[in-house]
Curated annotation (Swiss-Prot):
One of its GO terms (biological process) is intracellular protein transport. The gene is RAB18. This is Ras-related protein Rab-18. A motif (Switch 2) lies at residues 63-80. Belongs to the small GTPase superfamily. Rab family.
Length: 206
């Protein structure tokens, strides 16, 4: 059934409670937005197949609770992940400041040294911004992460965040091949895509 799928990738979404992790996931997988969405209890899980540079990848996306009382679940959902999306709310500086804690947790429990990280500043549709875009970009560069600002509400930047993350994973030797039965798929080298298209001006490939 999935003969044309290059690989299955495990993607995590982490960050403080209320930053919009579930909203980003629902916008990406179902193209829906619910302003009254309840906080995630434990771990939610969705699957979506996307095509990047002509290669199909099935994403198993784990949406995690930000609350401290659910941290006992941590080791199991970090295990085997190839990509992680760290989310903060651009209107809440505290969620940006606490990114260091999430990075420390990632380093503690992640089983791969070459996991690809994407930093997402969410809720750019709101007026009361507390974290400047350049601050996010600087933090991402410091920690060798991809970076994008997004809005789950307006859909701005959401698709790009996931696509750029997957593209980087596929371009990283040894990160996913063991999961794909060595199908010998030839990867295309698409340099021009970073200058325009749907993702133009958003992502910084680091």
């Amino acid at each position: 059934m999935d003969e044309d799928v290059l690989t299955t990738l495990k993607i995590l979404i982490i960050g403080e409670s209320g930053v919009g992790k579930s909203s980003l996931l629902l916008r990406f997988t179902d193209d829906t937005f619910d302003p009254e969405l309840a906080a995630t209890i434990g771990v939610d899980f969705k699957v979506k197949t996307i095509s990047v540079d002509g290669n199909k990848a099935k994403l198993a996306i784990w949406d995690t609770a930000g609350q401290e009382r659910f941290r006992t679940l941590t080791p199991s959902y970090y295990r085997g992940a190839q990509g992680v999306i760290l989310v903060y709310d651009v209107t809440r500086r505290d969620t940006f400041v606490k990114l260091d804690n999430w990075l420390n947790e990632l380093e503690t429990y992640c089983t791969r040294n070459d996991i690809v990280k994407m930093l997402v500043g969410n809720k750019i549709d709101k007026e009361n911004r507390e974290v400047d875009r350049n601050e996010g970009l600087k933090f991402a560069r410091k920690h060798s992460m991809l970076f994008i600002e997004a809005s789950a509400k307006t859909c701005d930047g959401v698709q790009c965040a996931f696509e750029e993350l997957v593209e980087k994973i596929i371009q990283t030797p040894g990160l996913w091949e063991s999961e794909s039965q060595n199908k010998g798929v030839k990867l295309s080298n698409k340099e021009e895509g970073h200058g325009g298209g749907a993702c133009g001006g958003y992502c910084s490939m680091l």
